[in-house]
Amino acid sequence: MSETAPAAPAAAPPAEKAPVKKKAAKKAGGTPRKASGPPVSELITKAVAASKERSGVSLAALKKALAAAGYDVEKNNSRIKLGLKSLVSKGTLVQTKGTGASGSFKLNKKAASGEAKPKVKKAGGTKPKKPVGAAKKPKKAAGGATPKKSAKKTPKKAKKPAAATVTKKVAKSPKKAKVAKPKKAAKSAAKAVKPKAAKPKVVKPKKAAPKKK
């Protein structure tokens, strides 16, 4: 009997350690659930958009709206203030009253409309790209028409020999002119010889010889 008594307390401690591991597993599994929720900035923008107050939503009203949505306002008070400041700096919210996180806030309608317009432009920009690509195909066909232009140019090459014949005729005509030039030179030489024959006519006053008779 004395041997069986100490064996019972030795089996008890491992049974106590098992529930501690289960608690740790629950804590580890619970952390991603908090991270899976939307960020504070999205919750703030939704709360401000849902309010119908013209003067803007105060910080107290924001906290009430966030608490109603299931957000822990007391633990995340600093996050709410940082989220408000970042949204104001980005331009999504406009601070109508107060300074910093304490005041009233409204949605910036210009920023909201500006964010919506580029999305429409992107969607519209993708559709016309296809017809532009289709228009490029006929350009390729027009490029295929270039051989036709080259075919038209070939008869011009055939016309070049005709131009060569014209040049030959032009070359022949100066030959005729060259033949005519020596004739003119001969005429000029004949004209030059005539005054030489006139010189002995001038010497006629030698008729004084009859005086000797």
Swiss-Prot record:
Alphabetized CDD domains for the sequence: H15
Residue(s) carrying N6-succinyllysine: 97
SMART domains: H15
Record-linked PROSITE patterns: H15 (PS51504)
Residues modified to Phosphoserine: 2, 104
Location of this chain's protein in the cell: Nucleus; Chromosome
Ranges annotated as biased composition (Low complexity): 1-17
Residue(s) carrying N-acetylserine: 2
Keyword DNA-binding found: yes
InterPro entries hit by this protein: H1/H5, Histone_H1/H5_H15, WH-like_DNA-bd_sf, WH_DNA-bd_sf
Processing after translation: H1 histones are progressively phosphorylated during the cell cycle, becoming maximally phosphorylated during late G2 phase and M phase, and being dephosphorylated sharply thereafter. Crotonylation (Kcr) is specifically present in male germ cells and marks testis-specific genes in post-meiotic cells, including X-linked genes that escape sex chromosome inactivation in haploid cells. Crotonylation marks active promoters and enhancers and confers resistance to transcriptional repressors. It is also associated with post-meiotically activated genes on autosomes.
N6-acetyllysine modifications at: 17
GO molecular function terms noted in the UniProt entry: chromatin DNA binding; double-stranded DNA binding; histone H3K27me3 reader activity; nucleosomal DNA binding; RNA binding; structural constituent of chromatin
Compositional bias segments (type: Basic residues): 119-140, 149-160, 169-186, 193-213
GO biological process, one term: chromosome condensation
Function, in words: Histone H1 protein binds to linker DNA between nucleosomes forming the macromolecular structure known as the chromatin fiber. Histones H1 are necessary for the condensation of nucleosome chains into higher-order structured fibers. Also acts as a regulator of individual gene transcription through chromatin remodeling, nucleosome spacing and DNA methylation.
Family that this chain belongs to: Belongs to the histone H1/H5 family.
Protein name per UniProt: Histone H1.2
Organism (species): Homo sapiens (Human)
Gene behind the chain: H1-2
